[in-house]
């Protein structure tokens, strides 16, 4: 199973993408996205044609929950983004930074990948979004969460995003 997930992740990265635990969304100003996934929920809003602010709540198997406030800044179109934010957990709060890449939408699909790191963790996610309706996307992803102390958490997830 791990080999299949890693092969899928590598193929999607060759297609060129990156992300935070919430999927990377391509939005227009002033669009808002609300999403629910296997272990997370989030809301984000495109405040300018280059900047998106967001808030995410995620439930970790071993480490309790964490809450993220973040900013994504489009560097090259909406395909390359810089990410910065702050994560609140049970006792280990962290500033973090990273990068996200996403592919242009083709036949209703766009792929993405991201990497973020803080003082006590790093996290990678690769995934694909499929447009189901005009403003509803289905998301499938693989994530790898590595705290500096403790066990790694990785797995496959799915979610729904509504944009308005």
Predicted feature descriptions by range:
Residues 2-164:
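Outer-membrane beta-barrel proteins
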